[in-house]
Each structure stands twice: as structure tokens, then as C-alpha cells.
Amino acid sequence: MRITRALVTGGAGFIGSHIVDELVSKGVETYVIDNLSTGTLDNLAQHKASGLLHFMAGDAREVEELLHDTSIDVVFHEAAIASVPKSVSHPLLVHDVNVNMTLQLLNYCVKAGVKRFVFASSAAVYGVLEGRATEDMACRPNSPYGAGKLAVEDYLHAYRRTYGLETVMLRYFNVYGPRQRYSDYSGVITIFINKLLEGGRPVIFGDGLQVRDFVHVDDIVQANMLAMESANAVGEMFNVASGRATSILELVRIVKELVGAKGIEHQFTPPRPGDTKFGLASMDKIRAVLGYDPKVEMQGGLKGV
């Protein structure tokens, strides 16, 4: 599919800004809608002189007012409250942003004749896992965040069947990399690094034996570009991960070595509601269908965080 104009919601944020980087490098005229609640214009500053970037401050629900009659070929929907803990403490807010806002964006896409919609879903749709997650397994989310992402996936299937909108769902696992924001709801890698750099003791929820599948943001971008370009992607869900298992205890050890803080002891606290013990992806489908090949290994990828 030939792409001349793309919209990235949440395009000033961690993952969205990296997608913008790749689109601009491909010569795609790129529109960004972001309310800057977690994103920053610093993430887009390198594109000011390109003539290809158009930034609009606002909510994705305002897409019609912001874009007017601009013709868009593909939408990358990255805007969300991406936090399991926040969905537990504020379920109605997270549902409104992650589900209701997406529905309004989908309605815009149908009215405006958008060809393809690439959705940032999540491994949280699976719930409690005992082995590698495969896309055809039953999803039983154990958090409001995961339930919301799964609800949107169902809507995307319905919009494809009803209106012909080409939809692709990318189930991100634990994403890390440059520009990841540090806050209470950040990814665990960013939290550990910042805590150790401040001389504090990193906090591990549970026993630290939880297994995660960490994937670098560059590989997330690769998956998004394949989702944009491949006819085989339409109507499909794909795990996006590295396929490599890392325990939280092993992660703490690696991060301590990286920042030169081996002498700082970590501390344990009870597990949080909605957290899972095991989170590892099967990569078979995305490799076979899209040719996805994760490039960044953790030791090298952490150095750029």
C-alpha cells in the first residue's frame, strides 16, 4: 500500500515519537495529535525543518476539528493511558481514554476514508499465562487495562467487517528504550534506572521471579512499519516482543551493573493487583506472516535508555 500521509496519535510520546521518526525518514507526511500529558515536543524537535511534520495539540477525540479535510492513509493509534496499576485505581478514566476515545477515532477513520488503522494493543489482553502467549489462545485479562485493550480489538474486527477499514492489532509486550518517561507508572526498566541513579533502593513487587519479555522500541517500530506495508497484516493480531525471557531479579542485576550500583540492595514488597507472574511471547506468527525479526538485545538496548 502506498502511504503519503499518516496520523500518529500520542506521537510526542515514547513509542509514538519513534514511529514518527521512521515515517519522516521514509518521506511520509506525518500528522501528530498529542495532548502532551505524557509526551513532549522535545521528542519531535529534530523534525522541525523537515517540512513533513505537522503537530496538533489536543485529544484524539478532536481529530475532525484538528485535521479538517486532510486526507490520511494510515493511522497509528498510540495514545492511551498505558498502565495496569492506574487502570486498577482509576478504571473509569482509563476506559474512557483507552476505549471510548478509540471508538471516536474509528468513526472518524470510516467517515474520512482512512485505509488502514494500526492499533497499539497489549500483552495484558492475555491475563495469567502459564506458557508462551500465542495469538489464537483464549484471552482472559485480569486487569481493567487488559480488558479495555481486548474490547478495542473486538471493535476493530467489527469495523473491518462492517465498514472495510483495514485494521491491524499489535500486542506489545514490555517495551523499553530512549525517551521512556520516568513516573510511578513507567516501565520497570526506567523506574529501576532512575531509582539507582538517585542512590535509592529499587523496589520489586513480589518475589522477583516474574518473567517478562522485554522488547526495544526500535523493534516495536519495525513491527509497525510491517503492519503498515503488508497486505497480510489486515485483520490480524500479532505479538510484538523479543521472545527472550528475563526475570525481574535478573533485570535488577543487569541494571545495577549498567549504572555502576552493584552495592545497592533492592527491596521486596507485596505484588500489585493485576500483575502477572509470567509474560513471554510466541513469535511464530509475526515472523511467518510479516517477516518480523527483533534486532536489539537487552544488554545493548539498555545503554541507550
What does each model-identified segment do?
Residues 1-175:
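N-terminal Rossmann-like NAD(P)+-binding domain of SDR-like oxidoreductases, especially those catalyzing
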Residues 13-16, 42, 61, 85, ...:
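Short, flexible micro-motifs
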Residues 17, 107, 150, 154, ...:
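Generic recognition of well-ordered alpha-helical segments
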Residues 22, 26, 108, 195, ...:
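Short alpha-helical functional segments enriched in proximate histidine and acidic residues
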Residues 39, 61, 89, 97-100, ...:
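Residue-level signal for the nucleotide or nucleotide-sugar donor/cofactor binding architecture
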Residues 66-70, 108, 195, 223, ...:
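CheY-like receiver
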Residues 131-132, 142, 154-212, 217-226, ...:
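NAD(P)-dependent short-chain dehydrogenase/reductase
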Residues 197-305:
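C-terminal substrate-binding subdomain of Rossmann-fold SDR/epimerase-dehydratase oxidoreductases
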